[in-house]
From Swiss-Prot:
Stretch list, region Disordered: 1036-1055, 1253-1331, 1377-1416, 1429-1449
Ranges of biased composition (kind: Pro residues): 1398-1407
LRR repeats: 64-87, 89-110, 112-135, 136-157, 158-181, 183-206, 207-230, 231-256, 257-280, 281-304, 306-328, 331-356, 357-380, 382-404, 406-429, 430-452, 453-476, 478-500, 521-545, 548-571, 573-595, 597-619, 620-643, 645-667, 669-691, 692-714, 716-738, 739-762, 764-786, 788-810, 811-834, 835-858, 860-882, 883-906
Taxonomy of the source species: Eukaryota, Metazoa, Ecdysozoa, Arthropoda, Hexapoda
Protein's name in the database: Protein artichoke
Compositionally biased intervals (Polar residues): 1253-1270, 1316-1328, 1377-1391
UniProt record, GO biological process: cilium assembly; locomotion; sensory organ development
Consequence of gene loss (knockout): Viable and fertile. Larval locomotion is severely uncoordinated and the chemotactic response to sucrose is reduced. Morphology of the lch5 mechanosensory organ is abnormal, with disorganized cilia and neuronal cell bodies, although cilia still make contact with the cap cell.
Role: Required for normal morphology and function of ciliated sensory organs.
Gene Ontology cellular-component annotations: cytoplasm; extracellular matrix; extracellular region
Length: 1535
């Protein structure tokens, strides 16, 4: 009895522990669980209604406590039934993009007491029952976003509700009973209803706690006088973006809102502010009237508004302001007026404002039509501090026009037409401290211009065309601190011009024509910029021009300096930053930097340095950043960096370095970043092994042939290693050991042929590695071992033909795999078994011909699958059936003629993009389902074409021709579709009609020399048949129909062969009468009856083979063996008995996958650097940017976008959730070089083109030109599709609804600038000309077509959750770019042949060159029922032409009467047989089979028995025997 309480306490403790922890992922699929502190979050995605319901039930079984957040996202849930969430204890609920159209009345039953917040983002949601929210006593926040919701549920009675947000485009009215009895409601947001035009009386009556009411973005044009009555605590009212034209109506409505402080009426239709518009608003402090059509402020517009402080009137059409529009009592407190971008052309309006607003402190009149300021126009205002008159038409300012303004501190008059020819001085402003006169026409400056400004501190005279500064120009401004005279035409500045300015600390004289350093600078100066001048030499040490003891920054870049004087900088002992980049320096002497011991940053890039004294840097003991990029250094000696122990960043790229001394970096214990790319290194120097603190090293574009593990083993803190574009041949075991912090490894574009097992073992933090563009042929077992954090792998542009199933051992986090542009012929050769967590798989541009079920069976989490540019001619079975989360499936440019509806039956509801363009589709009744689907889903692309050129979506099939087919193209038959099989899976030949032909027959069964044998290919297969007689050798060309003994039309659709796997072939033989089996059991057809087999005699041979312990494969290609008599036998093998049971209508339960989903780690996503090829290099080797540097980013943790409870005085809700109608990321637009039609077809050869840039680029004033330094931006755009062409340049772009506007773009062939209009016109016109024939295609133009050359995929689509805002930094430039030069179509084009010609395309003349690649970031969402173009999948773009891979040669064809092995096929490379390491393949058919709802395992008396060659269990034989025995008993009893 004493043990019972202990047992109960133990059970309670276990339950408490389970309640506070997450169950394993496989237990609650398709949901996932994560912890955030002590809070539990459940996230269910990419599934359908039955799976989600099963997942929620599993969650209910495994989690007994409360669930803090439940997120259902990107599912296919058309409706939510009652008690959908069961008895789960949900605190916060999020539904986002699940295609929900309606919910039942009791969908939230049993959640009344616990639910605190609801967040619903469902664009297709049409109805929410009015009473569905009743009883939610603890509800604090509700958010609903939809496009179809016309009627809102009843919110009344939610006593705890504090926050309500509803955004719907179909809302037309707001009944008054919706908002009753809400005593705690503080915030209401009702937006987006363009049909909501009226607000009736008493709508918000009695909301005593309401503080913020937002009714913006609706169609309101009438509001009842008492619609907003009895809101005693309302502080903010937002009515912007409506159709309000009567501002007086609003003024009368808000008159009773005593505590109203902020009123927003911007973006309406207001044309005039009439008398009495705003009266008796005692607490109103901020009024927004901007972005209307206001032309006039009339008399008495504002009356008794004593607290009004800020008025926004910008972006209107104001021409006149009445002097008494703001009466003295009303305008006495106004402090800021924004009036920019109006049409005020007379200074009287400006004067009226100043007179009416005696306390005005800020006035912005920029962007108006003011042309002159007469005498005394702006005088006598005692409080004005800031006056902005930028971007007007000012040509005349009379003498003393600005005076008697003692408080004025800042005056801006940028971009006018002022000149020094006007009467001076303009002003008498003793308190003015900042003056901006940039972008005017002052050619000369003398003392009269700045007279009357004794307190001036900051002066901007840039971009004026100045040619002269008089020596006494600043005589009246002794307090001047900052002077900007950049971008002028000054050639000399007199030494006495600035000498008396004792407070001057910054001078910017960049981009002038100065020949020498400015003389006579005051000793207090701290910052000097002389960038972009014509300075050829620096003053000698004896000169006082650089005797500046306080100087901290000196920029002398982009000049013509050839040498540095001895001790030239010793007078600037406080110098911290020195830039001598882009000059003509040829050597560094030991005395060049003496005297500047405190220097921290030194830029010497892009000079001609070929000789540097090893003592030149000895004085720089404090140096932290050194840039020697793009010089001509050949070696790094022992003592060159010996005294720079604090160096943190060192750039030695693009030199000619061949050797590094073993002791060169002995003292660099602080070095974190080292760039040695673009040199001539032959190995990784031993001297680099001492960099213990190194975090980032770039050794790409060298001639390194071997990686010394003992050297890189010293980089214990390294995070990124780049070794691309070298000559590395092999990765040996343990090459990258002892690198515990390594996250990114780039080995692309090398000569790697072999990766030994364990070469990348034990890298616990490795997230991404790139082995693209190498010469890999196969990946063996345990090549990539123990990589728990690995997320992405890149193998594109190799020669891969085989990947072992155990190649990724203990790498369970892999979610992105790129295998495009390889030599895979069969998907069975890709070991995907251990990659169960894959979400993105790219198999584009291989030689795959058949897509079958088994190779893809384990990919339950796959979201995106790309198989473009293969030779796929058939999809067998249902390979996508186990992919409930599949959103993107692309099979462009293959050989598919027909696509069965049943192939996509289980994924049609969830898939967003199904791209089969470029296939020779037969537009017959079988394809009608796809045509209907394209129309029903409003698919944003034109879709595939028929062979006659029509679009499939617009093709119409007559009903009379499709009598036997349903709406999905499935042929209806009254007969039995089950093929007649024996217990081995043989199909009797009498069931195969004469007109049957396998579409892929001519292309199967052959391989190139050196390919591994297929799975299951062994001598045992041929033991079942008589030996074949050798046939004469055949040619490699396609076999024409004349060579065949008889025509072979397509297969009769009455025969369903879906229960077979991989490849099936049949001889043509006339069928026996009747299509079904003569034996049935209760209507189910029975296979062939063999009494000998029934009593055991038929299994003798199989038992003997089984006892010999030969592991037989699970699948095999069909074999045709020519017999002397001309008769043949056909074998078909089944993967398991469960496939056949589908025809017997037995429901088979899928086994739960034991997969670990540990990839959601809450880490900060870091922005990967994406390198451009946009700079100049002279005298060095051609070096390109890092080719396969991707922008893969670790997936955001699922907590991002979660809930924060919304309570008073607390910001909460789903704040980070991004609007799905907008895309984020880089949209890259480039110019098209060459013939557009050839480029679209993917034909071309890449070459490198150097860019020649000017030595000193000047800023340009034209909007169509770009300056020397481009700014790379990330813009949020509407979801229009922007076509990305192969040649890519990073530019700032913005995409609008119907067009793409490019702000800056440059061509790659010259320095000529291309205007945005020219760029868009050239690209769109040339490409649009291809689609003039079809109306639907003409509507799509090119923005709706995926890029033809996109064949690879980046990893940003892994989660399909919008990431947080990215901050893309400006990246260093490169001097070489890649472009695509078109070739003739005959060089590399694939011509589609007829049914009997399946000759593969010839290989290219040479392997693909190493080239640049770039990522394009887009997002994929479910295509909703609206006219909104959906973005394409994220794609990894390679700038080299795809072509066909090296070695993709013609395969041998099978004739109709024989199958022979040619001499070429017999010359196979001697490899380990495929069966070694394929135990997992055979084990999959040893699993327990659930035949009758149980899990019984059927065993024979001896060891387990397999089917001949197909690894089938003996249970199927036993089932045959049992069925036959029962049938015989029934027949005996009937007799």
């Amino acid at each position: 009895m004493m043990l019972l309480p202990i047992f109960l306490l133990l059970c309670i403790g276990i339950n408490l522990i389970r309640a506070e922890s997450c169950p394993p992922s496989q237990a609650i699929l398709p949901c996932r669980c994560s912890l955030r502190g002590k809070e539990i979050q459940i996230w269910c995605s990419h599934s359908n209604l039955p799976q989600i319901m099963d997942g929620l039930k599993a969650v209910e079984r495994n989690i007994k406590g409360r669930i803090d957040e439940l997120v259902l996202e990107n599912n296919q849930l058309p409706a939510l039934p009652g008690r959908f969430f069961g008895s789960l204890q949900i605190v916060r609920l999020m539904l986002r993009h699940n295609s929900i159209e309606r919910v039942s009345n009791g969908w939230l039953n049993e959640l009344e007491n616990g639910l605190v917040e609801i967040f619903v983002v469902e664009p297709q949601l049409r109805s929410i029952p009015a009473e569905s929210l009743n009883g939610m006593i603890n509800m604090l926040a509700i958010t609903i976003q939809s496009e179809e919701l016309k009627h809102l549920p009843d919110f009344s009675g939610l006593l705890s509700l504090t926050y309500l947000s509803v955004q719907t485009g179909a809302l037309q009215e707001l009944p008054s009973h919706l908002f009753r009895h809400l005593p705690k409601l503080q915030h209401i947001h009702i937006t987006g209803g363009s049909g909501l035009t009226r607000l009736e009386a008493g709508l918000f009556d009695g909301l005593i706690s309401l503080k913020n009411l937002d009714l913006s973005h609706n169609g309101l044009n009438w509001i009842h006088l008492r619609a907003l009555s009895r809101l005693p605590n309302l502080v903010s009212l937002k009515l912007s973006h409506n159709q309000i034209s009567d501002v007086g109506m609003v003024g009368r409505i808000v008159k009773d809102l005593e505590h109203l402080k902020k009123l927003r009426l911007d973006n309406n239709l207001i044309t005039v502010i009439e008398d009495g518009s705003f009266v008796d608003l005692p607490n109103l402090s901020e009024l927004h009237l901007n972005d209307n059509r206001i032309t006039e402020l009339q008399y008495g517009a504002f009356l008794r508004t004593p607290q009004l402080k800020t008025i926004y009137l910008q972006n209107n059409l104001i021409r006149r302001i009445h002097p008494e529009s703001l009466l003295q009592a009303s305008g006495s407190g106004v402090e800021a007026v924004h009036m920019y971008n109006n049409e005020i052309g007379h200074v009287e309006a400006l004067r009226a404002l100043l007179d009416a607003l005696p306390r005005l402190r800020y006035l912005d009149m920029s962007g108006n039509l003011l042309s002159e300021l007469p005498y005394g126009a702006l005088r006598g205002h005692g409080t004005l501090e800031q006056l902005h008159l930028n971007h007007n038409h000012l040509r005349l300012i009379e003498r003393d026009a600005l005076m008697a303004m003692p408080a004025l501190r800042e005056l801006r008059m940028r971009n006018n037409s002022l000149s020094s020819d006007l009467p001076l001085p303009f002003w008498n402003l003793p308190g003015l401290k900042g003056l901006d006169l940039a972008q005017n026409q002052f050619a000369r400056v003398d003392s009269q211009l700045l007279a009357g400004l004794p307190s001036l501190r900051r002066l901007d005279l840039s971009e004026n065309g100045l040619i002269e500064l008089a020596p006494n120009s600043f005589r009246h401004n002794p307090l001047l601190e900052t002077l900007n005279i950049s971008s002028n035409e000054l050639t000399k500045i007199h030494s006495s011009t600035l000498i008396h300015l004792e407070r001057l600390f910054e001078v910017d004289a960049s981009y002038n024509q100065l020949k020498s350093v400015i003389a006579g600078l005051p000793r207090i100066v701290e910052r000097i910029s002389l960038k972009g001048n014509q300075i050829t030499s620096l003053p000698a040490a004896a000169s006082k021009d650089l005797q500046l003891p306080n100087l901290r920054m000196l920029d002398l870049s982009q000049n013509r300096i050839e040498q540095l004087p001895r001790h030239g900088f010793q007078g600037a002992m406080e110098l911290r930053v020195l830039s001598l980049a882009q000059n003509e320096l040829r050597q560094l002497k030991d005395t060049s930097f003496i005297g500047i011991q405190r220097l921290e940053l030194l830029h010497l890039q892009e000079n001609q340095l070929g000789e540097a004294d090893e003592r030149a840097l000895l004085p720089l003991a404090e140096l932290r950043n050194l840039n020697l990029q793009s010089n001509k250094l050949e070696a790094i000696t022992d003592n060159f960096f010996s005294n720079n122990s604090r160096l943190e960043q060192l750039d030695l790229s693009r030199n000619l370095i061949r050797s590094i001394s073993p002791t060169a970096f002995d003292t660099q214990r602080s070095l974190e970043y080292l760039d040695l790319s673009g040199n001539a290194l032959l190995d990784i120097s031993v001297g680099l092994g001492n960099l213990n603190n190194l975090r980032d090293i770039d050794l790409s574009y060298n001639q390194i042939s071997r990686i010394q593990s003992d050297v890189i083993g010293g980089w214990r803190n390294v995070v990124e290693i780049r070794l691309s574009n070298n000559l590395i041949v092999e990765l040996q075991q343990g090459t990258f050991r002892n690198l515990p912090k390594l996250q990114y490894l780039d080995l692309s574009s090398n000569e790697i042929r072999n990766v030994e097992p364990g070469a990348l073992k034990g890298l616990d933090e490795l997230q991404e590695f790139v082995l693209a563009d190498n010469k890999l042929v196969e990946l063996k077992d345990h090549v990539f071992e123990e990589l728990p954090s690995l997320l992405a792998s890149h193998f594109q542009y190799n020669k891969l033909r085989y990947i072992s199933p155990e190649s990724f051992h203990n790498a369970n986090s892999l979610v992105f795999l790129n295998l495009s542009n390889n030599h895979f012929r069969n998907m069975e050769n890709i070991g995907l078994r251990s990659m169960r967590n894959l979400e993105v798989l790219d198999l584009s541009t291989n030689g795959v011909k058949l897509v079958s079920t088994m190779p893809l069976k384990a990919l339950n989490w796959l979201v995106e699958l790309k198989m473009d540019n293969n030779q796929i001619c058939r999809i067998q079975g249902s390979p996508f059936e186990t992919m409930p989360r599949l959103r993107v499936l692309s099979m462009r440019n293959n050989q598919l003629r027909s696509i069965k509806e049943r192939t996509f039956r289980n994924v049609r509801g969830n898939i967003a993009i199904l791209d089969v363009d470029g296939n020779p589709i037969d537009c017959n009744c079988e394809m009608q389902w796809l045509s209907v689907w394209l129309q029903e889903t409003n698919f944003p692309y034109p879709g595939p074409k028929c062979q006659d050129g029509r679009l499939l979506r617009s093709a119409r099939m007559e009903r009379s021709l499709c009598v036997g087919a349903d709406i999905y193209g499935n042929e209806r038959t009254d007969g039995n579709q089950l093929p007649l099989l024996n217990e081995h899976g043989d199909v009797f030949q009498r069931d195969l009609p004469d007109d049957f032909n396998d579409e892929c027959e001519a292309g199967e069964g052959t391989r190139l020399p050196g390919d591994r044998p297929l799975v299951g290919e062994s001598e045992y297969f041929y033991d079942q048949y008589v030996d074949a007689t050798e046939a004469p050798d055949t040619t490699h060309s396609a076999i024409s129909t004349s060579q065949r003994p008889k025509p072979t039309p397509t297969i009769n659709s009455n025969i369903d062969l879906n229960n077979t796997i991989l490849h099936t072939k049949y001889f043509n033989r006339k069928p026996q009468p009747g299509s079904g089996s003569p034996f049935t059991f209760f209507g189910y057809p029975l296979p062939s009856v063999s009494l000998g087999r029934f009593f055991g005699f038929g299994d003798r041979g199989r038992k003997q083979r089984t006892d010999s312990n030969d592991d037989m494969p699970a699948t095999h290609r069909m074999a045709h063996i020519s017999l002397p008599s001309g008769r043949g036998k056909t074998r078909m093998y089944q993967p398991n008995s469960a496939e056949f049971e589908k025809y017997l209508k037995d429901q088979q339960k899928q086994e739960k996958l034991n997969i670990a989903r540990n990839r959601y780690v809450d880490t900060d996503s870091t922005t990967s650097s994406m390198e451009d090829a946009l700079s100049n290099e002279s005298g060095s080797a051609a070096t390109t940017v890092g080719v396969f540097r991707t922008t893969f980013r670790e997936p955001s943790s699922i907590e991002r976008g979660g809930f924060r409870p919304i309570v008073p005085a607390h910001v909460g809700g789903f704040m980070p959730v991004h609007d799905p109608q907008q895309r984020r990321g880089l949209v890259e637009v480039v110019n098209i070089t060459g013939n557009p039609s050839e480029i679209v077809q993917g034909i071309g050869q890449r070459k490198f083109i150097p860019i020649s840039t000017q030595a000193r680029p000047k800023p340009t004033k034209s909007s169509g030109e770009s300056s020397e330094t481009a700014t790379y931006e990330v813009t949020e755009t509407t979801p229009d599709i922007t076509t990305t062409t192969p040649l890519m340049q990073r530019i700032a772009t913005s995409t609008t609804k119907a067009s793409t506007t490019t702000t800056r773009s440059t061509t790659t062939t010259s320095t000529t600038q291309v205007t945005p209009a020219e760029n868009n016109a050239s690209s769109s016109t040339e490409l649009d000309s291809q689609y003039d024939d079809e109306d639907l295609e003409a509507q799509s133009v090119t923005l709706l077509r995926p890029p033809p050359l996109v064949q690879t995929t980046t990893a940003e689509t892994i989660l399909l959750i919008p990431p947080a805002e990215e901050h893309v930094a400006q990246i260093k430039s490169r001097s070489w770019v890649t472009t695509t030069t078109p070739q003739s179509p005959s060089d590399n084009q694939v011509t589609l042949a007829g049914p009997t010609s399946t000759v593969p395309p010839p290989p290219p003349a040479s392997p693909p060159l190493r080239g640049g690649g770039r990522s394009t970031i887009t997002k994929v969402y479910t295509p909703y029922q609206q006219q909104v173009a959906q973005p394409t999948a994220e794609e990894y773009q390679r700038t080299t032409p795809s072509g066909d891979n090296e070695g993709v040669a013609s395969e041998h064809q099978l004739t109709a009467n024989a199958q022979k092995r040619t001499e070429l096929e017999l010359l196979q490379v001697d490899r380990v047989d495929r069966k070694d390491g394929m135990d997992w393949y055979y084990e999959s058919f040893k699993k327990k089979r659930d035949f009758n709802g149980g899990a019984a395992v059927r065993k024979t008396a001896h060891k387990e028995v397999f089917y001949d060659g197909v690894a089938a269990s003996s249970s199927w034989n036993r089932l045959h025997k049992e069925i036959l025995f029962i049938s015989l008993l029934l027949l005996w009893r009937a007799c």
